[in-house]
Design a protein with these regions (language model features):
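Structured interaction patches on ligand/partner-binding surfaces of diverse proteins
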Residues: 44, 71-86
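Conserved "repeat-terminator" motif of extracellular CCP/Sushi domains
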Residues: 86-104
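Structured extracytoplasmic
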Residues: 94-95, 106-277, 283-291, 353-470, ...
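A short, amphipathic beta-strand motif
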Residues: 6-14, 50, 88
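A short, solvent-exposed beta-strand micro-motif common in secreted/extracellular proteins
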Residues: 59-69
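Short, acidic Ser/Thr/Gly-rich low-complexity loop/linker segments typical of extracellular
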Residues: 32-51
Length: 927
């Protein structure tokens, strides 16, 4: 039975000055038979204002308060007591270490770096941080065991109430020995072989054996597992910045920022695993910056070696869904004197609505079998980059519970061992099974067809659910139903497809795709390394030039436009496509395909072939032939190299927008060769080649944010109609699309050579955290720039006299086929008319500035279009002039020259205020 809860809350202050003390270490003590009173697992720290709250139900009643530069204070409570508004006074102390004396009293005012022995100490540690550790050796191998557990925290319910009574089987699995009662719901164990080579720098981790049981094995694993791996990835305190929780934290051993970013205090000399060590405490200068509080335990000799460290994420940091995150890491000395990692313990508490109830996560990693001498076989590092590469989970050997009892270096607790029984009982409960199925459907976008809606057991899943209903101007309400097979049906052969119907165009659409993978898969064809052959047939609506990888065209979110939509430039396209793809472990991949399409103009799009004829007087006459449709035969080869990337590919073969880490660079070179056949409708036919290159990378600036950068360039080498030209990616939805132009209309500009730049800087609260009042909102600033510079060569410009066979650029049909009716008296095209034109000499540019982390998941951006707010169109119209220049209200008349010939000018487009400026939102959960 659970014991009574003992709790206390209050403020810690300086006993002399009354100043509040932040970051005081507060923990309950527990009694042992041979060591007396020792720190328990129940602890916390005071916040920036010195406030604290702590409680436990394990029977602990002695509380310890410890602060750098102050005498330790102990407070005894009655078991079950609940005290509030307690003021705890700490007495300043002076710590001596040999001839070093540091007095951190009033540290905020008196801390100095110059002449500070703590600063000199950390400088010595930093200068020697690479000298004694295994990473300084030419090579090494080691074994590592890691265990990760997840637990539901603060399980305080009345099991006798009607609602909870049906879940009362959980009660026997509740662990009451911690701060709050919790239930362990998932365990993951890995045994790895780790390899390291210094020159050239290479690291590899091979997952030898694994065991996953519990809730994690029930939910859709894909991106969930990848994100968990990224959150709990290995970190090295010797690096200048530490990659944790999808952010960069300044390391207390940073060679560039440590001394200016942190304040250091010598606390005492203590014994750590038999070594006399200096306890060096540190706190960030700004508690809301991306840094740590903690302790470094430095061997007290001339080597300045780090024996152990304990770091915590400050509670005031601008971090979502994490109320506690700490890492404790220790080193051991090998026989040759080299220091190597010994054990790492990572603890985190995640929450959704408040930080009292949430999910506890704990990972323990133990290193053994260090070998610095045996040569590493060459094939171990074959085709690998300098980045760590982990084998696909499906290659790991799986062992039963009995075998793991002999493999793991330390046993599971009773509660960890009971997870299997808990899950077995939970999955038999209809209410819990329905909840798991609902969560799986929302996160995976698919609904399983098994009775229990278990994605791991289903042979066919319906989805994506967010594409079942959508809307667009051409189709009206679009209804779609589809799905995909899973590895439960066949682990190498997969099929997927859909049928769709528009209530306005009344045309059925469909897709049927077959995939054969050369390797066996455990869920879908794109998990792990991709190596497959894929064939598909599809008939659907497309908008020329628009890439549906940004957001699927019939996604429900794409149905919400920023303004009243016009009839789209669209086409009905039939595809018959075959594709081969091979991806290697170093993230080099090759993809080849052949695609036959039949393209039929739809909406207000027309394929109007333009021919020019020179007249006897050397003038030119223009004739137009309606092509209607054309056939296209296209081959493609794509090479991509993304060293160190961990990218989740969804069931449609599209990169997930929740893609894990984006730090790895991506280089992509694509070449298309094709033949556009329009001869059956009076066209000329075109052979074309098009080449594109893309570079994508996230650049981190330690705790000061990061820059997401994409550079893209391409060229069409031969003459071809506008459907083969480059048309920048655009977004007409109210939702912000990154790496697309949000204030440009679809197909507004045409080009056959271009360079595009997309850059977004995330400040991560760097500036806003320093503004009083604003910092309480936890907002984060973000700015972006998107620009494209390009051109249209003469061979692909249908408006140049003598350029025959090309298609007229798309435009809303003029009234009565008269171009003049589409323009006002000043030569500007009227609202409601869409046109495409060659891009001019200036680059197109737009900028955004906004705030993210509004209510933790909303981002709002103001967008401004910088260029092409008033520009020339390729259409010639007759100039209009006032009938009476002195009284324009009398009307206008067509202008003629002195010979009575019409005065022709280029029409213009003027972007209105709503076109130049916009506001868009994004829903984005981030830590």
């Amino acid at each position: 039975m659970a014991q009574e809860v003992t709790s206390i809350s209050g403020t810690v202050v300086d006993g002399d000055t009354g100043e509040t003390l932040p970051f005081v270490q507060i923990y309950f003590l527990k009694s042992t038979t041979n060591k007396g009173m020792i720190p328990s697992e129940v602890g916390t720290t005071s916040d920036i204002d010195g406030n604290f709250t702590i409680s436990n139900s394990a029977g602990y009643n002695t509380l310890n308060f410890q602060m750098l530069g102050y005498k330790t204070e102990m407070l005894t409570l009655r078991k079950g007591q609940n005290r509030k508004n307690v003021k705890v006074k700490l007495t300043p102390d002076v710590y001596g270490l040999q001839d070093i004396v540091v007095t951190p009293k009033n540290r905020k005012r008196e801390y100095k770096r110059k002449g500070n022995p703590a600063v000199e100490l950390i400088k010595n540690v930093i200068a020697r941080k690479d000298s004694f550790y295994v990473t300084s050796k030419d090579q090494y191998t080691a074994k590592s065991y890691s265990r990760m557990s997840f637990a539901l925290d603060n399980i305080k319910v009345n099991w006798e109430k009607p609602f909870w009574k049906k879940f009362n089987f959980i009660q026997k699995y509740v662990d009451t020995t911690g701060v709050y009662p919790n239930v362990t719901v998932s365990i993951r164990e890995h045994l790895n072989s780790e390899y390291y080579q210094r020159k050239p720098h290479r690291e590899k981790k091979i997952l030898e054996k694994k065991r996953v049981f519990g809730v994690e094995d029930l939910v859709s694993q894909g991106s969930f597992q990848e994100n968990v791996n990224a959150i709990f990835k290995d970190v090295d305190i010797n690096d200048n910045s530490m990659n944790m929780l999808f952010n960069r934290f300044v390391s207390p051993l940073s060679s560039t920022l440590a001394v200016t970013f942190y304040q250091y205090y010598i606390m005492d000399t203590i014994m750590v695993d038999g070594y006399p060590c200096i306890d060096l405490a540190f706190v960030p200068v700004n508690s809301e910056s991306y840094g740590f509080t903690g302790h470094l335990y430095i061997v007290n000799d001339s080597t300045f070696r780090l024996k152990k460290y304990a770091i915590n994420v400050p509670p005031d940091i601008n971090l979502n869904f994490v109320s506690n995150y700490s890492v404790e890491h220790s080193y051991k000395q090998l026989e040759d004197g080299t220091w190597a990692p010994d054990r790492t313990t990572t603890y985190a508490k995640f929450y959704i609505l408040n930080n009292k109830r949430g999910m506890l996560a704990r990972q323990t990693k133990i290193y053994t079998d260090w070998d610095l001498e045996t040569p590493i076989p060459r094939e171990t590092f074959s085709a690998l980059t300098a980045d760590e590469v982990e084998t696909n989970d499906s290659t790991a050997q799986r062992f039963g519970a009995a075998a793991w009892d002999t493999l793991r270096p330390e046993p599971l607790t009773w509660y960890e061992n009971s997870v299997y029984d808990l899950v077995r009982e939970a999955t038999a409960n209809p209410s819990i099974a329905s909840l798991v199925a609902t969560v799986n459907a929302i996160t995976s976008e698919y609904v399983a067809t098994t009775p229990a809606r278990d994605l791991d057991e289903s042979k066919f899943d319906f989805g994506p659910i967010y594409n079942f209903v959508s809307w667009n101007k051409l189709e009206g309400v679009r209804l779609r139903i589809g799905g995909t097979s899973t590895a439960r049906l066949h682990d190498q052969f997969f099929f997927r497809g859909y049928v769709a119907f528009g209530t306005t165009d009344l045309r059925p659409k469909y897709n049927a795709t077959l995939v054969w993978t050369f390797d066996k898969h455990k869920s879908q064809p794109y998990d792990g390394l991709r190596h497959h052959i894929q064939v598909s047939a599809q008939y659907d609506v497309e908008e020329p030039g628009q890439n549906t990888d940004i957001i699927r065209r019939d996604h429900i979110l794409a149905s919400i436009p920023t303004s009243t939509p016009t009839m789209p430039f669209a086409q009905y396209v039939f595809h018959a496509k075959a594709e081969y793809m091979k991806e290697w472990r170093n993230k080099l991949s090759i993809r080849t395909s052949f695609d036959f399409t039949n393209n039929e103009a739809a909406g207000v799009l027309n394929y109007h072939k333009v021919d020019w004829t020179m007249n006897a007087d050397s003038s030119w006459s223009k004739s137009v032939t309606d092509i209607g449709s054309y056939r296209n035969y296209e081959g493609m080869v794509e090479l991509e190299y993304s060293p160190g990337s961990r990218i989740y590919i969804d069931r449609m073969g599209i990169r997930s927008p929740f893609a894990i880490e984006k730090d790895a660079p991506t280089f992509r070179l694509t070449h298309y060769v094709g033949y556009l056949d329009d001869r059956h409708n009076g066209g000329d036919g075109f052979i074309y080649n098009r080449t594109e290159f893309l570079f994508d990378k996230r650049f981190w600036f330690s705790a000061f944010g990061h820059l997401d950068l994409r550079v893209q360039t391409g060229m069409l080498w031969q003459k071809a109609p506008f459907t083969k030209l480059y048309m920048p990616q655009t977004s007409t939805s109210i939702f912000l699309a990154q790496r697309a132009f949000n204030q440009m209309k679809p197909m507004e500009f045409m080009m056959d050579e271009y360079v595009a730049l997309y850059a977004t800087y995330y400040f991560k609260g760097w500036i806003l955290n320093r503004i009083p009042g604003i910092n309480k909102l936890k907002l984060r600033g973000v700015v972006s720039f998107s620009g494209i510079y390009g051109g249209l060569t003469k061979k692909n410009n249908p408006y140049l006299e003598g350029t025959n066979g090309l298609y007229d650029f798309p435009h809303t049909p003029w009234e009565n086929n008269d171009v003049q009716n589409a323009f006002d008296n000043n030569g500007y095209i009227k609202d409601g008319y869409r046109t495409s034109s060659p891009i001019g000499k200036l680059p197109y540019m737009e900028i955004t500035a906004g705030f993210e982390n509004i209510f933790k998941f909303i981002r709002i951006d103001y967008i401004r279009r910088i260029t092409y707010n008033d520009y020339e169109l390729p259409y010639l119209i007759q100039k209009m002039e006032p009938i009476n220049p002195n009284n324009p209200t009398l009307g206008f008349q067509p202008a003629v020259d002195e010979n009575g010939q019409p005065v022709m000018i280029h029409g213009r487009r003027k972007i209105g205020a709503w076109g130049r400026n916009g506001v868009k939102i994004t829903f984005r959960f981030s830590l």
